[in-house]
């Protein structure tokens, strides 16, 4: 069996500054989402728009630490007042797979969805998973993301990168192999 080539069709990323999320989320939606989730959905939608793709076959995300701010808020409330006081939103948003799940819910995507949480190897693992599935012919497109927030106690920094991988060379920026080093440096 020969492997199919894999191409990068679009990349979207955010620096430390946030865009105007009101363009994408209603006030009610925005209140229920932490900053990390807003940034993840934002870059994912922008990458898909840039790629001219409405729905990927798979969503694969990587996060070094997940939403540490939500985890800290949940555990702090639990410590302060026992199990009666924590906000459920803080707990739900503290799990690492919440990022990929929310992107899938927002898009209505019912395909393959996986999250990698391996500290410095998370994004590489997510890219490898998507590359393998496309090159083997299991899927044709994948939305791959790397999302983290600045949290001093663990030395993490803001990351919001979304990449659309595809089996089709049409509209591609280049091959996966040619651009891999650039992606991992972002």
Tell me the role of every PLM-derived stretch:
Residues 1-112, 117, 121-125, 132-139, ...:
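Conserved "HGTGT" condensation-loop signature of ketosynthase/thiolase-family condensing enzymes
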């Amino acid at each position: 069996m020969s492997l199919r080539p894999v191409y990068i069709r679009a990349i979207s990323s955010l620096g430390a500054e946030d865009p105007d999320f009101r363009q994408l989320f209603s006030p009610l939606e925005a209140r229920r989402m932490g900053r990390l989730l807003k940034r993840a959905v934002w870059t994912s939608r922008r990458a898909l728009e840039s790629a001219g793709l409405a729905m990927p076959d798979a969503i694969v995300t990587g996060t070094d630490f997940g939403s540490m701010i939500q985890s800290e808020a949940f555990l702090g409330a639990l410590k302060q007042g026992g199990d009666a006081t924590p906000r459920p939103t803080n707990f739900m948003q503290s799990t690492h797979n919440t990022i990929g799940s929310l992107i899938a819910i927002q898009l209505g995507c019912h395909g393959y969805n996986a999250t990698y949480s391996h500290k410095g190897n998370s994004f590489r693992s997510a890219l490898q998973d998507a590359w393998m599935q496309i090159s083997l012919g299991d899927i044709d497109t994948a939305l791959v993301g790397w999302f983290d927030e600045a949290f001093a106690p663990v030395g993490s920094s803001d990351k919001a990168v979304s990449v659309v991988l595809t089996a089709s060379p049409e509209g591609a920026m280049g091959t996966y192999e040619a651009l891999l080093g650039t992606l991992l440096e972002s």
